[in-house]
């Protein structure tokens, strides 16, 4: 099997712009990417590809193979799947709470496809045993779409339900979960800029 991580550093994570500058966001996404790669390697996955529209931020990448594709996410991933002859694990790059144990659980499924739901109907990871028979369709309620694609193509699927694997970092409030549950460079980076504060029974961020 092999893993592929879609990644784009330039202008990353615009929804974090209320709390992080462009430079900070680009530094942060690079840290998250490297943590995802380390988790994959910790789970015993050696074949790791980064699928990106640009080499920006990947010039010195040695932990994974960089594949350039300027098409949109779905076209690039579907081209990748069509050319794959072994099981593929698609993992998003913004999952700093993802651990090797999650990856082992996802990839050990007995089903044809394993789908990891993200917040708001998204898809954080997809393990596909027969990639040439499957097509992805991200954006919108992609979790439901990916379940339907599996059914429509005659493939059974498992839903891997995990709070940590299901927590992608897109919004400022997601940084709260990273500070509470995370560890490693991504958490350390955010903890140098923010601390947690409880107000009116809710946990929020306060700038240091």
Swiss-Prot record:
Keywords: GTP-binding, Nucleotide-binding, Nucleotidyltransferase, Transferase. Its EC number is 2.7.7.68. One of its GO terms (biological process) is F420-0 metabolic process. One of its GO terms (molecular function) is phospholactate guanylyltransferase activity. It catalyses: (2S)-2-phospholactate + GTP + H(+) = (2S)-lactyl-2-diphospho-5'-guanosine + diphosphate. Belongs to the CofC family. This is 2-phospho-L-lactate guanylyltransferase. It comes from Methanosarcina acetivorans (strain ATCC 35395 / DSM 2834 / JCM 12185 / C2A). The lineage of its organism: Archaea, Methanobacteriati, Methanobacteriota, Stenosarchaea group, Methanomicrobia.
């Amino acid at each position: 099997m092999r893993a592929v991580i879609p990644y784009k550093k330039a202008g990353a994570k615009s929804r974090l712009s209320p709390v992080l500058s462009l430079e900070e966001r680009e530094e942060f996404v690079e840290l998250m990417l490297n943590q995802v790669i380390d988790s994959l390697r910790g789970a015993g996955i050696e074949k790791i590809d980064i699928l990106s529209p640009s080499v920006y931020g990947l010039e010195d990448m040695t932990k994974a193979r960089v594949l350039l594709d300027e098409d949109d996410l779905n076209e690039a991933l579907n081209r990748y799947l069509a050319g794959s002859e072994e099981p593929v694990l698609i993992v998003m790059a913004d999952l700093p709470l993802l651990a090797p144990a999650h990856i082992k659980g996802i990839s050990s499924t007995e089903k044809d496809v394993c789908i990891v739901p993200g917040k708001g109907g998204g898809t954080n990871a997809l393990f596909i045993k027969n990639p040439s028979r499957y097509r992805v369709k991200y954006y919108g309620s992609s979790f439901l779409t990916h379940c339907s694609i599996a059914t429509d193509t005659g493939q059974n699927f498992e839903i891997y339900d995990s709070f940590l694997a299901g927590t992608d970092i897109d919004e400022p409030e997601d940084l709260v979960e990273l500070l509470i549950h995370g560890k490693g460079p991504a958490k350390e980076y955010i903890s140098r800029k923010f601390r947690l504060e409880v107000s009116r029974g809710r946990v929020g961020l306060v700038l240091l």
